[in-house]
Design a protein with these regions (language model features):
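Carbohydrate-active enzyme catalytic cores, enriched for enzymes
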Residues: 1-91, 148, 284, 317-423
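Extended, loop-rich substrate-binding clefts of extracytoplasmic carbohydrate-active enzymes
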Residues: 35-58, 125-178
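Short, glycine-/Ser/Thr-/acidic-enriched flexible segments
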Residues: 53-56, 65-68, 86-90, 96-99, ...
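Active-site rim segments in enzyme catalytic domains, especially the processed small/beta chain
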Residues: 72, 76-142, 148
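Acidic, contiguous internal or C-terminal segments within carbohydrate-active enzymes
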Residues: 151-211, 287-338, 398-422
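Polysaccharide-binding surfaces and accessory modules of carbohydrate-active proteins
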Residues: 194-261
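A surface-exposed beta-strand-loop module
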Residues: 269-288
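Short, low-complexity, charge-dense intrinsically disordered segments
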Residues: 424-447
Length: 447
């Protein structure tokens, strides 16, 4: 879950208080590299989605209770995210500021929803700030799904902090991490009338954030080549890693994404300016949007192409498209020679979009050089391509995953079969053996 370059210099104050100097010193001297893996801490409500490529990454989702009793030290931060990559902080918590002040705003601003990486509705907090150490209308958070596969990690959670509004609103957040690739964060607001929705992304003070166009923001370390100034000397963490934040094109969110500044509190009573990306829209509910976070290294930054359909015009930068149909919501991410499709069922019935049809709750595909290179199906019993069976599970499955580059083929439960069409689309001759290994057989002829 941590970078192999973990050192005492990068430890937070909280870790030192929790484990003590002796434990910190032992960790700094450790010769074995910590394992990078996703892990859940359900009792505390923390879910860590981790990856090791192209460098160590860990996103922490806060899905726990706001606090004990009236949540004196709690913040209104349900479903907020924090992200570390390549040994440094990227998406951060705003801190606490001060506890006691003549102006209540000094205390309430940094413990409010707007100071965290989550959704705010109608400009109000998820809970109602009372005294400096108490809240009312404290939300309840539910974790609806958690899967840590070999080539992906998936989290779904929701909270009812806005149920107190005249038109009650529920915020549901999906986080899907593709190993070695993109993060897709899907935010849904369930309600019946028009509301102002806002998602804020707070970045560490030592990062440079540039709006490249209305739908894409580039985040880089200060002094890196990506920021346009001379690169710093030292490790990749000091100059090569970067992040692209992409919102869907041709949506109200695309034109309402802005880069500004805010204040963080790295220690009690201390404040520091830091970059903030604010995405907002006034929309009729139910409504949703997605944010793609694409890690990169400056030295291997890639150009892009188009997505689900083959033979499409090349593009120079990553683009995220959003398409909604009656039964499925689709997000398409295009970059380099890769096309990434994210399909989310909107109900219990089967759906179809383009060449794909399935009863899976979530489907992900990566097409590279006109070949299927990665496939994930969460829930459901089948996946089909152009009306022909591709994959079949014996019953509703937790998930199925296949990835070409490292021979991953995995499912829970393990009773599934792939057809000859699967080999045709993937060029993977291992599919027949995979069927035999799982006491299954192909069930359709090659078309």
């Amino acid at each position: 879950m941590y970078s192999s370059e973990f050192s005492a210099a990068r430890l937070t104050e909280e870790v030192i208080w929790s484990f003590g100097n002796q434990a910190v010193e032992k960790l700094a001297r450790a010769k074995t590299s910590p394992v990078v893996r996703s892990i859940a801490f359900p009792d505390g409500g923390l879910y860590v989605l981790a990856d090791s490529q192209p460098y160590a990454q860990a996103m922490v989702v806060d899905a726990g209770p706001q606090g004990v009793g009236r949540s004196g030290h709690g913040h209104a931060d349900a479903l907020s995210l924090r992200l570390t990559m390549d040994g440094r902080r990227w998406l951060v918590d705003s801190g606490s500021g001060v506890y006691i002040s003549k102006d209540p705003a000094d205390r309430n601003t940094l413990r409010g929803t707007g100071a965290h990486n989550t959704m705010r509705v109608d400009g109000v907090d998820q809970a109602v700030a009372d005294e400096p150490f108490s809240w009312t209308h404290i939300p309840s958070t539910q974790v609806e799904n958690w899967i840590a596969g070999k080539s992906f990690t998936y989290f779904v959670g929701s909270h009812n902090g806005y149920a107190r509004l005249v038109d009650p609103v529920v915020h549901r957040r999906h986080v899907l991490k593709i190993a070695g690739g993109v993060w897709l964060i899907r935010d849904i607001a369930l309600g019946r009338t028009e509301h102002e929705l806002e998602i804020r992304w707070h970045f560490a003070p030592d990062l440079e954030v540039r709006r490249v166009d209305s739908g894409r923001v580039e985040i880089s370390t200060l002094g890196s080549e990506a920021s346009g100034s001379p690169a710093q000397t030292g490790t990749a963490a000091s100059g090569e890693s970067g992040l692209s934040l992409i919102v869907p094109e041709e949506t109200v969110w695309h034109t309402a994404t802005e880069v500004t500044r805010t204040l963080l509190s790295p220690a009690y009573g201390a404040f520091q300016p830091a970059p903030l990306v604010r995405c907002h829209a006034r929309v009729m509910l139910p409504a949703e949007t997605a944010t793609a976070l694409l890690p990169r290294r400056g030295a291997i930054r890639r150009e892009d192409e188009r997505l689900i359909a083959p033979h499409v015009e090349q593009k120079l930068e990553p683009r995220l498209a959003s398409v909604a149909q009656a039964a499925v919501q689709v997000y398409e991410l295009d970059y380099h020679e890769e096309s990434h499709g994210f399909f989310f069922a909107l109900g219990d019935e089967a759906w179809s979009f383009g060449p794909w049809s399935s009863d899976a709750r979530v489907l992900y595909c990566r097409i590279e050089k006109e070949k299927l290179a990665h496939l994930i199906a969460i829930g459901g019993t089948y996946v089909a391509w152009q009306g022909q069976p591709l994959l079949k599970m014996a019953g509703p499955s937790a998930f199925f995953e296949w990835r070409e580059q490292d021979a991953v083929m995995n499912a829970t439960p393990g009773d599934f079969s792939v057809t000859p069409l699967f080999e045709e689309l993937t060029g993977d001759s291992r599919s027949s053996a995979a069927n035999l290994n799982r006491n299954s057989s192909s069930y359709a002829e090659k078309h």
